[in-house]
Amino acid sequence: MSDPNLNDDATEPRGLAADTADDELDIVEAADEQDEFEAAEAEAGEPAEVAALHIEDEGDHIAETDEDIEAGAVETDEDVETDTDEDVEAGTDEDVAVAEAAEEEPAAPVDSIQALREELRTLPGEWYVIHTYAGYENRVKTNLEPRAVSLNVEDYIFQAEVPQEEVVQIKNGDRKTIKQNKLPGYVLVRMDLTNESWGVVRNTPGVTGFVGNAYDPYPLTLDEIVKMLAPEAEEKAARAEGKPAPQRKVEVQVLDFEVGASVTVTDGPFATLQTINEIKSDSKKVKGLVEIFGWETPVELSFDQIQKN
């Protein structure tokens, strides 16, 4: 028969041993967990706490960087605004200076002759010279435009001009300045030469023909037409600018002839012009009657063909 006390003593060591084994197992497991944790940290490269600290530091650094960027952006905006304002002010000052300089400096004078040359170069058509009866120049010029329209050639006949010049006439002691035809008996016409336009010009009352070949006249050169129209262009430009007309040499004509006077013919077959019926100062001619074989015949003579009796 066994002793109960012995059984209890035997049981206690076994329970103690079991507890000890459990404790050792817990220690081993804890050690294993510690080893696993350390291995994980080693693999991560740094402890979790240090990583957390680094994350916080990086957050602070990012925040500081954002603040720096914002501050830099503000400074940049201020710099840009300042530079822009300075540039605008500088540009405005320069514009004002340029405007003032432009006001102070007079505009370069325009060469009226060169301007006329450029204008004539761009105009359509060419310039031709037509011959007219003496004293019919302005009448031919006035009639050409309506004739061109009525005969449907206004697209070919563009312009007619009678060049004028100033002369001084002295008659009976009186001196006066007048304008007269520079080319007595001639009219300048700008046109495209076609059979139709040629016919309209040639058959205008007062026209005797084209200068040059009757059916194929030659046009004036640019230099020739500029020379003829330059005086009027200069006067027109001077009036537009409010300036006096350019000074040029003016012809002086002394008219010693009067209507009704008797003169002697110094050139030609006529000895005496009985009576002057008309004086044409523009063409420097007179009309009168001469006796030929006992008959009075009307003639036209120039000033240099007669002298006062």
Curated annotation (Swiss-Prot):
Residues 65-91 have a biased composition (Acidic residues). It comes from the Bacteria. This is Transcription termination/antitermination protein NusG. GO terms for biological process: DNA-templated transcription termination; regulation of DNA-templated transcription elongation; transcription antitermination; transcription elongation-coupled chromatin remodeling. PROSITE patterns: NUSG. SMART domains: NGN. Belongs to the NusG family. Residues 1-24, 58-91 are annotated as: Disordered. One of its GO terms (cellular component) is cytosol. Participates in transcription elongation, termination and antitermination. InterPro entries: NGN, NGN-like_dom, NGN_dom_sf, NusG-like, Rib_uL2_dom2, Transcrpt_antiterm_NusG, Transcrpt_antiterm_NusG_bac_CS, Translation_prot_SH3-like_sf. The keyword Secreted does not apply. Keywords: Transcription, Transcription antitermination, Transcription regulation, Transcription termination.
